[in-house]
Design a protein with these regions (language model features):
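A short linear hydrophobic-aromatic micro-motif
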Residues: 59-61, 95-101
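DNA replication initiation modules
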Residues: 61-82, 88, 115-233
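Short, ordered beta-strand-loop transition motifs
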Residues: 30, 65-67, 104, 151-153, ...
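Conserved short hydrophobic interaction patches
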Residues: 90, 94, 126-134, 257-260, ...
Length: 360
């Protein structure tokens, strides 16, 4: 067994040509500890990891490597009033292969460690599924990119690592909301490594047995049990789905869904109101409303026959990074495709659209 720093280095292996460094400031903004972040275009070393563990210099790694593969990923929940104990319990209850760590400002990083490298796109897809099942479908996923334009200087985005210094704020959680020691974390993370085959076999709701080819959010909410407080809006959207699937029998299907999956069932008069509402006009899914929003998996939903594929045309933008050259060069993910942009193309809609047409 190697040293702490070597094991930590191996666990968070990522891009070999760059890493991140963080300087913590003595200020907070909207509940988040402020810091200066910078990408260093040099390899991370075991010596730098030791400095991180000793609290001398905070480092982060870029999960995606130069070949668009990764050996770990993370769900980044930036909610600083987060109930970490409840989150830990939900991860455990759903039997997800995630290590729950507190972030520096009180949010959470949920790490997934692989026994083999997998495509960054596969990592992002699976973590998005897990995040949606946990009710955090709109949070950030690392790696932020599926593909890097490595030959153009694109290195991706880094995530801060846990166990900085005496780790008063960044540590892995225990069942009773305590903290794991560094050695215990390393043991747990190494034991939690999973193969691609075993990862692909995990399905947390939304596996198609309920509401086939429907939005994964509705599938997950249904399979977990539709609770009070979310019944009306969930059933409205279930009704929208059934109207598309079976225009003749959707009313009966909606009533059956209510009886089988709502806890407790919605009163009959409320179901009638929903049916009358859907009779008056054709609605589309209310994706921005709860509880759908928290269980959103937009990328997967777009592939479903009765998902949002025909109702939403706005592109999904993520993973913006910059090479601070003269002039600056920007990189952005558009529906999973990596674009290289000038500042003008990034600022002006017509120029941005032209770049999309030329590069995608």
């Amino acid at each position: 067994m190697g040293t702490q720093e070597q094991r930590f280095f191996d666990l968070f292996e990522g891009h070999t040509g760059a890493h991140g460094q963080t300087s913590i400031l003595n200020t907070q903004r909207r509940g988040k500890q402020e810091a200066d972040y910078i990408i260093i275009r040099e390899p991370l070393t075991v010596e730098l990891v030791r400095e991180h563990l000793d609290g001398k210099r905070g480092v982060g790694t870029i999960p995606i490597d130069e070949t668009n593969m990764c050996s770990y990923g993370a769900i980044d929940i930036d909610d600083y009033d987060l109930d970490l104990a409840a989150l830990y319990s939900k991860v455990t209850r759903l039997k997800l292969p995630l290590i729950t760590c507190r972030s520096k400002s009180g949010g959470a990083h949920l790490y997934l460690f692989m026994s083999e490298k997998i495509a960054a796109s596969e990592m992002r897809d699976k973590l998005a599924e897990f995040a949606a099942a946990l009710g955090w479908g709109t949070c950030e996923i690392f790696p932020k990119q599926e593909v890097l334009l490595a030959d153009r200087g694109d290195v991706g985005s880094f995530i801060n690592l846990p166990y900085f210094g005496e780790y008063p704020t960044r540590y892995a959680l225990t069942e009773n909301n305590g903290s794991l020691s560094l050695d215990a974390f390393l043991d747990k993370a190494e034991d939690a490594k999973i193969s691609l085959k075993d990862l692909a076999a995990i399905s947390i709701g939304g596996d198609g047995t309920v509401l086939p080819q429907g939005p994964p959010c509705l599938q997950q909410i249904t399979e977990l049990g539709i609770p009070e407080g979310g019944r009306n809006n969930t059933l409205l959207n279930v009704g929208i789905y059934y109207k598309m699937v079976d225009p003749e029998s959707w009313r009966e299907l909606l009533e059956k869904h209510n009886q089988e999956y709502c806890i407790p069932s919605l009163p009959a008069k409320e179901i009638v109101k929903i049916q009358e509402q859907l009779d008056r006009k054709d609605y589309y899914y209310t994706c921005k409303q709860e509880p759908l929003h928290s269980h959103c998996n937009k990328v997967l939903c777009k592939t479903r026959k009765y998902g949002i594929g025909n109702g939403e045309t706005a592109p999904t933008l993520s993973g913006l990074t910059v090479v601070e050259s003269e002039p600056p060069v920007w990189f952005l993910d558009v529906n999973g495709m990596r674009l290289e942009l000038s500042t003008k193309q990034l600022q002006m809609q017509v120029e941005f659209q032209r770049a999309c047409m030329e590069q995608i």
